[in-house]
């Protein structure tokens, strides 16, 4: 591999010929250029769809067995991982330890630039060791340019512990090769502002993490149709969403849906089981548990037994 001090050959560091007069564009021309270039993020995800789908399947399989999902990154990549992890508990009612974000420099790096902390592979190794990663876990390394030592150290450490490793980069393998179980390359080309990977590289990373985490939760039975039936009812907005889900799927009035939601302990999935089967809260909970929380399978099983 080329000397990592020489990065000009990397796709993410190259100069975009379409934006060489960026400082001379009108505001409208600038917006049009960004809009045009951002279309490449959708194309990049499409080109990596097989690898992303494989990541969903294999990650869901590990989590079913009691594993955890970790995102590891530095700078923008790290912040995006932390963001995606933080959205899982309210959206899918997952425990905070199930999906975690690890960023070089820790929590302080979320709001203050700490890019100098990404250059120590041993820190990535230590981050994995501190979380007692095992063969049941999944570690996703996110690095736009593919060379971040913190991320590479974390992935290498996770591989040694038998974890499933996923590498996400925005440069082709011919420029930066790296060994991981699943290699996802999101090629969006040079940035409008040369080297600023918070732009297209950041956008395509966010798109991919959206798909990965949502896909995994779908496979884990956290979704019914396209409804977030495991939503955590923790504020008025989410209570309204929970009530609308119940109203739409059961035909109940809002008042009746509210009563059902309270009887279920504010768990939409359990409320639906109770409504569709006639079971009480405890029996409905046992039925869901017997089917690993999969609402569709639980209800179908109950009805197939002649109930």
Swiss-Prot record:
It comes from the Bacteria. The active site is at 87 (proton donor), 118. Disulfide bonds: none annotated. GO terms for molecular function: carbohydrate derivative binding; carbon-oxygen lyase activity; ether hydrolase activity. Its EC number is 4.2.1.126. InterPro entries: Etherase_MurQ, Glucokinase_regulatory_CS, MURQ/GCKR, SIS_dom, SIS_dom_sf. Pathway: Amino-sugar metabolism; N-acetylmuramate degradation. One of its GO terms (biological process) is N-acetylmuramic acid catabolic process. It holds the Pfam family GKRP_SIS_N. It catalyses: N-acetyl-D-muramate 6-phosphate + H2O = N-acetyl-D-glucosamine 6-phosphate + (R)-lactate. Coiled coil: none annotated. Keywords: Carbohydrate metabolism, Lyase. PROSITE patterns: GCKR, SIS. Residues 59-222 form the SIS domain. NCBIfam families: N-acetylmuramic acid 6-phosphate etherase (TIGR00274), PRK05441.1 (NF003915), PRK12570.1 (NF009222). A lyase-type mechanism (elimination/hydration) is suggested for the cleavage of the lactyl ether bond of MurNAc 6-phosphate, with the formation of an alpha,beta-unsaturated aldehyde intermediate with (E)-stereochemistry, followed by the syn addition of water to give product. Belongs to the GCKR-like family. MurNAc-6-P etherase subfamily. Specifically catalyzes the cleavage of the D-lactyl ether substituent of MurNAc 6-phosphate, producing GlcNAc 6-phosphate and D-lactate. Homodimer. This is N-acetylmuramic acid 6-phosphate etherase. The gene is murQ.
């Amino acid at each position: 591999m080329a000397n990592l001090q020489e990065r000009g050959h990397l796709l993410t560091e190259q100069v975009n010929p379409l934006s060489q007069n960026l400082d001379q564009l009108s505001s409208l021309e600038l917006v049009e250029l960004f809009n045009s270039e951002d279309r490449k993020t959708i194309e990049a995800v499409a080109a990596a769809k097989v690898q992303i789908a494989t990541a969903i399947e294999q990650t869901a399989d590990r989590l079913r067995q009691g594993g955890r999902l970790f995102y590891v990154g530095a700078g923008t990549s790290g912040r995006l991982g932390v963001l995606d992890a933080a959205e899982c508990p309210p959206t899918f009612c997952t425990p905070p330890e199930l999906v975690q974000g690890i960023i070089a420099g820790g929590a302080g790096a979320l709001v203050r630039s700490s890019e100098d902390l990404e250059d120590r592979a041993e820190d990535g190794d230590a981050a994995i060791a501190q979380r007692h990663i095992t063969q049941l876990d999944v570690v996703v390394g996110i690095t736009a340019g593919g060379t971040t030592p913190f991320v590479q150290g974390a992935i290498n450490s996770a591989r040694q512990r038998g974890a499933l490793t996923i590498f996400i980069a925005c440069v082709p393998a011919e420029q930066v090769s790296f060994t991981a179980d699943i290699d996802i390359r999101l090629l969006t080309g040079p940035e409008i502002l040369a080297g600023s990977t918070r732009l297209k590289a950041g956008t395509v990373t966010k798109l991919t993490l959206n798909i990965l985490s949502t896909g995994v939760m779908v496979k884990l039975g956290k979704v019914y149709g396209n409804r977030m039936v495991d939503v955590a009812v923790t504020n008025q907005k989410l209570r309204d969403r929970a009530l609308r889900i119940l109203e739409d799927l059961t035909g109940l009035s809002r008042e009746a849906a509210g009563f059902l939601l309270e009887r279920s302990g504010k768990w939409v999935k359990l409320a639906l089981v109770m409504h569709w089967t006639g079971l009480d809260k405890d029996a409905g909970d046992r039925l869901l548990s017997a089917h690993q929380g999969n609402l569709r399978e639980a209800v179908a099983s109950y009805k197939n037994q002649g109930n």
